[in-house]
Regions:
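Glycine-rich nucleotide/cofactor/substrate-binding loop typically near the N-terminus or early
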Residues: 71, 84, 89-91, 96-162
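A glycine- and small-aliphatic-rich helix-loop capping segment at beta-alpha/alpha-beta transitions
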Residues: 94-99, 132-140, 199-218
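Generic N-terminal amphipathic, Lys/Arg-enriched alpha-helix
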Residues: 40-41, 78-90
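Active-site glycine-rich loop that binds ribose-phosphate moieties when present
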Residues: 174-177, 205-239
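N-terminal basic/disordered segments at the start of proteins
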Residues: 60-73
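Internal active-site segments that recognize and position negatively charged phosphoryl groups
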Residues: 173-200, 229-239
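N-terminal mitochondrial targeting presequence
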Residues: 3, 11-60
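Short coil/turn connectors at secondary-structure junctions
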Residues: 74-78, 82, 109-114, 151-153, ...
Length: 239
């Protein structure tokens, strides 16, 4: 039963009760007015699409998609999304960049277009250049790259806007599985490939430490995730 159905049911009950004390002509205008208000309220309470589209459109103004990825998406050429924390936080430089580029080369050799996702120069970038991958790896090795989960996207982009206005230094952001999946799903990239995903941490029954990767997996509608499973450090029995 939707919100509208519930309110309609309540209106019918109210109408029956009021008919004993009010004439029908007096009741009908009140019911009609109530229905109009309920219909308006229903559009806000029972549908998240307007909220989702608003938040998505706000984020889309800070997304930069490479020409290669744009052309591929328009022409139904397979695109594969890749996260960037493996570059900045997973390995030391220059092995991190070498690995990332090798993965992209493998994807390209299979007739697909790689789309590594990161936050660079105040924008979410979908499809990095080799120079940007090298920058992410080099600065990540120095600890100058922020790990960005879904919840961190808005703050880092907001801080980037402030930095732009004050000519401050723009912080680099490497996207985790949840952030990468969010962006890939928005862009309708069909496949996202990664190593291990997050899950339920040990002692989660007291710490409630559960990765946002799992939440994002339940939300994604356009993107499937291909991975090796949850990371071995997690409580795999509670995955």
């Amino acid at each position: 039963m939707t919100c509208y159905d519930e309110f309609e049911y309540l209106l019918k009950i109210t109408k029956v009760k009021n008919q004993s004390t009010m004439s029908l002509p007096a009741v009908e205008p009140a019911v009609a007015a109530a229905r109009r208000r309920i219909s308006s309220l229903n559009s806000h309470l029972c549908s998240s699409s307007s909220l989702s589209s608003t938040s998505s459109s706000s984020l889309s103004t800070r997304i930069f998609v490479s020409d290669e990825v744009q052309i591929a998406l328009r022409n139904n050429i397979p695109v594969v999304a890749l996260e960037s924390t493996i570059i900045s936080h997973g390995m030391s430089y220059p092995e991190n960049c070498k690995c990332a580029m090798e993965v992209e080369d493998i994807i390209s050799s299979k007739g697909c277009v790689p789309a590594t996702i990161a936050i660079i120069d105040g924008y979410v970038k979908v499809g990095l250049t080799r120079k940007e991958i090298d920058k992410l790896g080099k600065e990540g090795a120095r600890g100058d790259v922020q790990k960005v989960s879904r919840r961190d996207i808005a703050p880092i982009l907001a801080n980037a806007s402030l930095s732009e206005s004050s000519l401050g230094r723009l912080k680099l952001g490497a996207t985790t599985v949840s952030a990468t999946l969010l962006i890939a799903d928005m862009m309708k990239i069909p496949v996202f490939v990664t190593g291990g995903i997050g899950g339920v941490h040990r002692n989660a029954e007291t710490t409630f430490d559960i990765s946002s990767d799992l939440i994002e997996l339940s939300r994604a509608k356009n993107t499937v995730v291909v991975c090796a499973g949850v990371k071995s450090i997690l409580d795999i029995g509670k995955r």
